[in-house]
From Swiss-Prot:
Comp. bias intervals (Basic and acidic residues): 25-35
Pfam families, per database record: Cor1
Region named Disordered: 1-57
Native species: Mesocricetus auratus (Golden hamster)
Protein name, entry field: Synaptonemal complex protein 3
GO cellular component terms given for this protein: chromosome; chromosome, centromeric region; lateral element
Residue segments, region Interaction with DNA: 51-56, 86-89
Modification note: Phosphorylated.
Protein's GO biological process: cell division; meiotic cell cycle; spermatid development
Source taxon at top rank: Eukaryota
Region (Important for oligomerization and fiber formation): 67-72, 229-234
Length: 234
């Protein structure tokens, strides 16, 4: 029966460590076989055969094999625990990074909406003021036109003045519209730059966190391997 720890460690890219443990076990097995062959030679020279002694020797080999099997299973369980802890830390760091990213993006979006709303409010008030003034001017022009219908020259002069006023009002509206578009584009550009910078910082933080987790995991795995090998060899 293959231990669960050895199967999982093969997926984690650490088969050489298990091979080293198996190699150490093979060396011990070879030593025992060599010592066993020497005992067989000694037994051939000795005319008396101890059958009970051979049975006890076979039981000792089985006990040693069981202990090695238990150590390997414990070694696999330690690797499984380390991998599970690594996975939990990665999930924790990833969730924290995603949460921070969402908060920053929401803040950027909220700021952008507030700035756009502020611009809309300011320029709406200015547009309304100019339009109201223009309507008042037109009303005055109509009233003056009705009163001065018999005075053509004076009416023509007023008409020319009104045309100049209308041209100025239209020019003011055009300037306000162009300024509004320019400010809106500047806000969008600044927010895009801020979003790009935030995304770049988040990528750097994720890379640093991943590197830190990998280093901690490698150190923990090496410590587990040393501990398992020491318990296996000594």
């Amino acid at each position: 029966m293959v231990p669960g720890g050895r199967k999982h460690s093969g997926k984690s890219g650490k088969p050489p460590l298990v091979d080293q443990a198996k190699t150490a076990f093979d060396f011990e097995k070879e030593d025992k076989e060599l010592s066993g062959s020497e005992e067989d030679v000694a037994d051939e020279k000795t005319p008396v055969i101890d059958k009970h002694g051979k049975k006890r020797s076979g039981g000792l080999v089985e006990d040693v094999g069981g202990e090695v099997q238990n150590m390997l299973e414990k070694f696999g369980a330690d690797i499984n625990k380390a991998l599970l802890a690594k996975r939990k830390r990665i999930e924790m760091y990833t969730k924290a990074s995603f949460k921070a990213s969402n908060q920053k993006i929401e803040q950027i979006w909220k700021t952008q909406q507030e700035e756009i709303q502020k611009l809309n409010s300011e320029y709406s008030q200015q547009f309304m003021s100019v339009l109201q003034q223009w309507e008042l001017d037109m009303q005055k022009f109509e009233e003056q036109g009705e009163k001065l219908t018999n005075l053509f020259r004076q009416q023509q002069k007023i008409f020319q003045q009104s045309r100049i006023v209308q041209s100025q009002r239209l020019k003011a509206i055009k300037q306000l519209h162009e300024q509004f578009i320019k400010n809106l584009e500047d806000v969008e550009k600044n927010n895009d730059n801020l979003f790009t910078g935030t995304q770049s910082e988040l990528k750097k933080e994720m890379a640093m966190l991943q590197k830190k987790v990998m280093m901690e995991t490698q150190q923990q795995e090496m410590a587990n391997v040393r501990k398992s090998l020491q318990s296996m060899l000594f």
